[in-house]
Design a protein with these regions (language model features):
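Phosphate-group recognition and catalysis centered on beta-loop-alpha active-site segments
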Residues: 1-379
Length: 379
């Protein structure tokens, strides 16, 4: 049920409806893009449509109706307002074609994979050119290793990052992770941060497995986490470097935010107002930030009152774009101190305005809009 008592039905992932909803309900969204046969960027995650076709082998007109072009999303005023005026964030994930599709060089031609990434960058660059979004509000990332080299061969102001470890574009959830396991073991989270920094990537997307659970102890090298000395080690090593973590579940969301990290959530149901930790849930820590007093007030609310309290505070708490300059400076200064951000306050404030936040700001991001809704478990 939502605030009006109506039953909420989650929109299909990566649809315009899901992405607009997610953008309005949290600090931003992540979406997946593929390049159709007629060079249109379309919203779709899986390597095949639900009818078994490779999206890259079909034109936009031939694709199923549920596969929408990115232009349809960018025509939505609510989406654009949140992104360009209210500090919300957009993560564009580029998907590589399945090698058996025959596109992007098939199984062996790495040069063609790079060319495919270049074509996607060029198309997105042209589509986004008329939109006035801040530099720190957008990133393009991909599991395709050639994304970084491709970005250097295209004239663009967009920022790029790699998803690591490399999850292949072929296989099912199990086989993809079996192939990626050696890379996971050989690369601790600090080592991944070093690689991202060397590539001048503005952030690091990573799996929760690096930070929580048995798997977090498997990586060689210095391990980090969300509690105790592991958290202290993470904060000290990170120095504010942005880390975006998926999945951000009910049992980890508050820990991620308290660590100064960004979480990608698959749950934005209106009734999801209580986390497993017992805390009331707040899905706009960046674009509608709580003061210390407001956080104490919300944390002190009995569980049975979470729904009404959260909805009440959504109406009362001042959103980022309506804060005074002094209030924004206070938030940035407080966050810098709390999480040991390395960059000087002047550099942070250059990225800070009514319509933007610095890269370091922790957020809640809607994964594929309102969450994944297909069987394949990859991000």
């Amino acid at each position: 049920m939502d605030e009006d008592g109506d039953k909420w039905i989650r929109p299909r992932e990566n649809t315009v409806e899901a992405l607009v909803y997610g953008m309005n309900e949290c600090d931003g969204i992540e979406l997946d893009l593929r390049l159709s046969k007629d060079n249109r960027l379309v919203l779709h995650h899986d390597s095949k449509t639900e009818f078994g076709d490779y999206p890259e082998c079909l034109s936009l007109d031939e694709l199923p109706d549920y596969v929408e072009p990115i232009e349809d999303l960018l025509e939505q005023k609510d989406f654009i307002r949140r992104w360009t005026e209210e500090g919300a964030f957009t993560c564009f994930e580029f998907k590589s074609p399945h090698p058996s599709s025959g596109k992007a060089g098939g199984w062996f031609n790495a040069k063609e994979r790079e060319n495919h990434m270049m074509k996607m960058i060029e198309e997105l660059n042209e589509i986004l050119d008329p939109i006035d979004f801040s530099e720190s509000s957008t990133v393009i990332y991909s599991f395709e290793p050639k994304i970084i080299s491709a970005s250097k061969k295209v004239k663009t102001k967009l920022k790029f990052s790699r998803l690591r470890p490399h999850i292949r574009s072929w296989g099912n959830w199990t086989s993809q992770r079996i192939v990626a396991t050696p890379s996971f073991i050989l690369n601790s989270l600090p080592r991944l941060m070093d690689k991202q920094r060397r590539e001048n990537s503005p952030m690091l997307p990573c799996s929760l497995q690096y930070l929580k659970g048995i798997e977090s102890n498997l990586s060689l090298g210095r391990t980090v986490g969300l509690e105790g000395k592991k958290l202290q080690r993470l904060t000290k090593y990170r120095k504010g470097y942005p880390v975006y973590v998926w999945p951000s579940k009910s049992n980890s969301e508050r820990m991620l935010l308290d660590a100064g990290l960004t979480g990608l959530t698959d749950d934005l149901a209106p009734t999801s107002v209580t986390l497993e930790s017992g805390h009331a849930r707040w899905t706009k820590p960046a674009t509608q930030p709580l003061t210390k007093e407001q956080r104490v007030d919300l944390d002190g609310t009995p569980i049975e009152q979470h729904f009404s309290k959260v909805n009440e505070m959504k109406k009362e708490v001042t959103p980022w774009h309506e804060l005074t300059e002094k209030e924004r400076i206070n938030f940035i200064s407080s966050w810098k101190k709390k999480w040991s951000w390395d960059r000087e306050i002047n550099a942070l404030m250059k990225e800070t305005s009514a319509s933007s936040l610095p890269w370091e700001a922790p957020r809640i991001i809607g994964h594929r809009g309102t969450g994944k809704s297909h069987k394949n478990g990859s991000s």
